[in-house]
């Protein structure tokens, strides 16, 4: 007999907590406030999901480029980190129904706002993306002539944009307002968002009991 023989939902219930992977550096979704407390939409969402399961949410801050690997090696039970549901990812992981719908937004400096009317305008430009993100995948697949610069942290992309190391970066449309509020008008969203994206809670395959419970919880929270 091993823990694997009992479903993950049962393990979570017996443990009294669900372990949640997130970056903790991705405002407004999940980040640390000035007191070092984890806050943000997905922090609240994960706590609400846990509440529906009758357990606590236990957060495991993890860099994005190690996030899916962390799920596989069981560092946590689920991920709530704006994980876009893609065909490739669905082959390896299960996802709940979407809890946010977003798109890709080009972020650039005020003086270059008119250079980026459509995604095709990214060709020949240095474009920042999160390492291992679907933005990186999208850029390489759709604008092969763009020069790709990869980043671990959003803050570094913003910094490099300001000093001119990159011409633009790609980000989640839903995160944009927060970013722009922090940037004193020098940084702008250029063009319309594109490539509609659905974000779900990611978990390891073979945990139908937990998947069903999470989907029901999302229904209940709507």
Language model features with spans:
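A ligand-binding cleft/hinge motif common to bilobed small-molecule-binding domains
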Residues: 66, 83-91, 139-141, 162-196
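Beta->alpha turn/N-cap motifs
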Residues: 22-26, 60-65, 74-86, 109, ...
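Alpha-to-beta junction loops
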Residues: 18-19, 54-56, 73-81, 125-126, ...
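Periplasmic-binding protein-like
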Residues: 101-108, 173, 177-219
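Flexible hinge/capping segments at coil-to-helix
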Residues: 109-127
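Extended ligand-binding regions for polar small-molecule ligands
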Residues: 1-3, 44-52, 131-133, 198-222
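Extracytoplasmic small-molecule ligand-binding "clamshell" domains
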Residues: 1-82
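Short helix-initiation/N-cap motifs at beta->coil->alpha
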Residues: 5-6, 43, 59-69, 114, ...
């Amino acid at each position: 007999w091993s823990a694997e023989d009992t479903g993950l939902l049962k393990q979570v219930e017996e443990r009294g907590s669900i372990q949640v992977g997130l970056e903790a550096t991705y405002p407004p979704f999940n980040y640390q406030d000035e007191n070092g407390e984890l806050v943000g939409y997905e922090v609240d969402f994960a706590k609400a999901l846990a509440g529906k399961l009758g357990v606590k949410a236990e957060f495991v801050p993890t860099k994005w480029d190690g996030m899916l690997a962390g799920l596989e090696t069981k560092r946590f039970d689920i991920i709530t980190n704006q994980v876009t549901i893609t065909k490739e990812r669905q082959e390896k992981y299960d996802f709940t129904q979407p809890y946010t719908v977003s798109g890709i937004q080009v972020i650039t400096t005020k003086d270059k706002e008119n250079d980026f009317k459509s995604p095709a305008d990214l060709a020949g430009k240095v474009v920042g993306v999160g390492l291992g993100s679907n933005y990186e995948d999208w850029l390489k697949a759709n604008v092969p002539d763009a020069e790709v610069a990869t980043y671990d942290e959003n803050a570094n992309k913003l910094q490099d944009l300001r000093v001119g190391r990159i011409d633009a970066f790609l980000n989640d449309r839903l995160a944009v307002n927060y970013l722009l509020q922090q940037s004193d008008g020098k940084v702008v969203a250029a063009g319309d968002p594109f490539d509609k994206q659905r974000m779900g809670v990611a978990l390891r395959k073979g945990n139908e009991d937990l998947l069903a419970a999470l989907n029901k919880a999302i229904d209940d929270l709507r």
